[in-house]
Design a protein with these regions (language model features):
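Short Lys/Arg-enriched helix C-cap and helix-to-coil transition segments
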Residues: 33-39
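A short, Lys/Arg-enriched interface patch at domain edges and termini
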Residues: 44-59
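Polyanion-binding surface elements
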Residues: 1-20
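Helix-turn-helix/winged-helix DNA-binding modules
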Residues: 2-3, 27, 38
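Short, solvent-exposed alpha-helical "recognition" segments
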Residues: 27-33
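Residue-level detection of the helix-turn-helix DNA-binding "recognition helix"
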Residues: 26-27, 51
Length: 59
C-alpha cells in the first residue's frame, strides 16, 4: 500500500500553509481520500500535482 499523508504532513513536506491542502482539494486541483472526517493524500498524487504545476523557465 502506498504511503498516505495527512494535510499537516503534506503542508510540512511542501513548506506551505496549513490550510493550503484543503484549499487545493476544494478547488479540485489535488485529489484526496476521505475516511469519515479524515482526509489523506497519496504521495504519487502529490507528485503528479507538482509536475502539472511546474512552470518552465524562459530566458
Amino acid at each position: 500500500m502506498e504511503e498516505l499523508l495527512s494535510p499537516k504532513e503534506l503542508s510540512r513536506l511542501l513548506k506551505v500553509s496549513k490550510p493550503w491542502p484543503y484549499i487545493m482539494v476544494k478547488r479540485g486541483l489535488l485529489p484526496c481520500y476521505k475516511m469519515g472526517k479524515v482526509i489523506r493524500f497519496k504521495r504519487c498524487d502529490v507528485e503528479e500535482f507538482l509536475e502539472r504545476s511546474r512552470v518552465e523557465r524562459r530566458g
